[in-house]
């Protein structure tokens, strides 16, 4: 019914927005998925259509997901041909994630690294030989260190490959009506802004369209609040002559005057990245009440670094370069005041049935049913988790939350789910059997069966772990009634 892409193109033109397309390489519904050349031809034809029928395209975004198709095969992609197609048809377009212009930060929680190098040893994984480079250097997209001197000294090539932090405004990436009141708080989004844009990354904030094809009112309200907050906070730089280029070396210090009678609590520093990224360390002091006070320090700067600190009536600010790769080129220094926000942290409801009174059967796995995602039940085997809810309910689905920590070992990828009325006779529920993309998106997953099952007991049986290890980890599990 019409051309959705064309409608979006026209809307972008109307409101002065740049237009990009997201085409997932992981089209497991295609009959030819997993058939190598046949699927690559099919995919490039789709890409060609998108890049020739809708005017200028500013970005082409590919996710890194890649699982088995219905035929049990994984697709081998011809990335060289795919990227050449983009450069031929849309030479100015940025290619992201599986492209070679912007890389994935390594998580989908909205958190950038505190040390983030755009000049990195991480070869784009669409390049031939990237797997061998990762193995030799001991790195991947999720590694903490992607650009230290030690790592760079071992690398044969360096890449200008800036980081993108992607996160959803809701608990998941797609629209669900039951999450209408689980939109991230303004305080949470501002923190994400500081941890992404303020840590030398770009921010991709996902806002899923609802069943009307519109952004839900709650999402729109929050986005407007975020926009106004950022505009208000960074509209007026209190530092005098902060935008003059400062060429410095290690040990150099520069003082800036601050406008009189102003309250500040946020420091900004930027490098002239047309000359590269060179700062490895810096400190910040403010002069207030007749003395200098240390208010912050950081490692990398890059395009932008933001440091919040306690409210201060600063008269001057002093910046010292403590580490660098040659001469650094600072393009901007700023001080701002950010209004304090109270974080009413969004609460994700994982179970429609209260977990009070639940018991695990055959083992002590209380951490999996205590209502807290931050506590984790982990065992060094692929062990089924059996729960007695204490009473019979009509189960329509279940939720699984992986561990909310950096170490994702034990996260379940493929599973079976069973229910029982007596704890003896078990029925296997009709479910997809896998938490697709959970390795890259370790958020709570909600599985709905499409019908209900009467049950007092349920069992989650892990079949494979994300890295094929014999470990099981559950942050929390719940049941759904609708």
Each model region followed by its residue ranges:
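Single, functionally critical "micro-switch" positions that shape active/binding sites
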Residues: 199, 359, 363, 371
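Short, charged low-complexity linear motifs
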Residues: 44, 358-363, 412
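Mature catalytic domains of secreted/periplasmic carbohydrate-active enzymes
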Residues: 1-282, 286, 294-309, 320-332, ...
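A generic alpha-helix propensity feature with a strong bias for hydrophobic helices
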Residues: 94, 127, 131, 212, ...
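Short, solvent-exposed loop/edge segments of extracellular or virion-exposed proteins
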Residues: 249-251, 350-362
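Surface-exposed loop and turn segments in beta-propeller and other repeat-based domains
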Residues: 434-437
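Aromatic, loop-rich ligand-recognition surfaces of beta-strand-rich domains
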Residues: 218-228, 233-347, 366-430, 441-482
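Generic hydrophobic-segment detector
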Residues: 186, 190, 361-362, 465-466
